[in-house]
């Protein structure tokens, strides 16, 4: 039987070098070149020890080759987390977050995020860079539409609904992805 995840993480961290820990904090971008003939070149660019990839192409061969490299060529075989900016849908496109907030229907947003999670997971995505919870204080800011507006309470209600939709009750479920609240304080 496998050790509980906390013990596995503690064990890995105790064996990692400083360089390996730093590489785990790195995130590469790949997959914007949709030419399947370049998959080998794309894979060569990615260090086996990195923690995550922004995964734009969602090509299963590319994903599998990069993951194989991480598992077989890194010293500890730590898998890569594949992330995608699915801020208002993945294959099915929904209104932007500001439009979602205008619905005053967080349950609907939760359902949309659950569908987004299912579609993203089927394409090999583990993690979305959503929801954006910056409170819009200045309408001139170019990313106002990615958030839920100017009211902190509304932002919180819709962000919570989004996270429930993406992650559900069981993060190990095959139709769920990790959510990532963004950005740092003061960005919006």
Protein language model features and the residues they cover:
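Glycoside hydrolase catalytic-domain context in secreted enzymes
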Residues: 1-188
């Amino acid at each position: 039987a496998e050790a509980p995840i906390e013990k596995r993480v503690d064990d890995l961290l105790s064996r990692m070098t400083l360089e390996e820990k730093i590489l785990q904090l790195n995130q590469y971008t790949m997959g914007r070149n949709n030419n399947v003939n370049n998959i080998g070149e794309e894979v060569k660019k990615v260090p086996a020890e990195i923690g995550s990839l922004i995964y734009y192409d969602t090509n299963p061969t590319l994903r599998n080759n990069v993951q194989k490299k991480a598992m077989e060529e890194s010293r500890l075989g730590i898998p890569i987390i594949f992330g995608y900016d699915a801020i208002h849908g993945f294959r099915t496109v929904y209104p932007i977050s500001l439009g979602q907030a205008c619905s005053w229907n967080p349950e609907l947003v939760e359902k949309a995020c659950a569908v987004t999670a299912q579609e993203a997971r089927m394409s090999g995505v583990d993690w979305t860079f959503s929801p954006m919870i910056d409170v819009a204080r200045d309408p001139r800011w170019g990313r106002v539409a990615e958030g839920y507006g100017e009211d902190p309470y509304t932002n919180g209600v819709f962000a919570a609904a989004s996270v429930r939709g993406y992650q559900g009750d069981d993060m190990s479920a095959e139709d769920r992805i990790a959510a990532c609240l963004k950005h740092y304080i003061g960005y919006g």
